[in-house]
Amino acid sequence: MKKFFLSLCIAAAALMTACSQAPAEATAPKANNIETILKNLHDPKTNQVIVVCHRGDWRNYPENSIPAIESVIKMGADMVEIDIQLTKDSVLVLSHDRTINRCTTGKGNINEMTYEEIQQYYLKTAHGTRSSLDLKMPTLEEALAVCKDRITVNLDKGYDYYDLVLEITEKLGVTDQVLIKGSKPVAEVQAKMAEHKNNLLYMPVITPTNEKHKPLFEDYLAEKPQLAYEICFDEINPTVESAVKRVLESGSKLWVNTLWNSLCGGLSDDIAFETSAAEVYGKIVDMGTTIIQTDRP
C-alpha cells in the first residue's frame, strides 16, 4: 500500500516532540474509518490531524477523477477536496476549471455543454496528456457514491450549488460527510440552511490581514463555535497569530492549506518536501492546526 507523505511527516514531527519530553514508540499512520474521521472532525479538543487531499491524488491520476479519489482513500486520508461545475443540462461534474480545455482532450465552457457532450472527451494527466486509463469526467453523484462511508469530502464551490448538492447528498445518505466553505456573511449562510431540515457542514474562510474579512471574522466569532476556520496567511505576523489564538479559544478547529506559500506563510508542501518535512509540518501543527490540506499525498 502507498504511504501517505504528509501523515508520515506529521507522525515524525509528533515523535520529535514526544522524544524531547518522554520516551515514545513510533507508529505508522493507520487508515481511518468514517466513524473515526467524523469523530475527530467534530472534536475541537483532539490533537489528531485531519489530512485533506487537494483534488485527490492528482500526481498519479487525473485530478478530480475517480481513481484519484480511490487512491487517497487507500492511503488512509481523512478527506478529499474536489471541485464542481454545472453543465448546460444541470449536471454537477467534477472540474476545477470552468472550461474542459486543461483537463480533458476537448475544448469548451462547461456551462455551455451538456453532460453527454463532455463525455465525448477523455481526462488528461498533470502532464497534459490523455490518461492511459481512458477516464471520463465524473459526476458529483458518482464521486460521492465512491466516498460514501469511506472518506469525508471538502466540496469546493459547493455553496454556489447548495440546493443541487444537498439533493444529491441526501439521496446518497452522505450529507454528514460533506463540508463546504466560503467567506459568505453569517446571515446569508444561516438563511440558506434554514431552508432545509438537514444541511452540509460549513466552514468560514478568513484571511486575517484582509480588511474586508475582519468584520466577517468578528461576526462568526460572535456565533456559536464553528466546526473549523480556514485561515489563510502569506506570513506569520501578530495579526495572524491573534486570529489563530481566537479561533482555538472559540472552540473551533484550525484548517491551514499547505498548497503554496501565500496560503501558509511559506510553510508549504514543496518547502517541506525540499527541506525538512517534519520541521515544516511541525510548525504548522504547533500553531494548533488540526486540519491540513495538502498537495503531496
Give each language-model segment a name.
Residues 1-4:
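Positively charged n-region of N-terminal signal peptides that target proteins for export
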Residues 6-7, 59:
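General helical structural elements
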Residues 7-16:
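Bacterial N-terminal signal peptides
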Residues 19-297:
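Phosphate-group recognition and catalysis centered on beta-loop-alpha active-site segments
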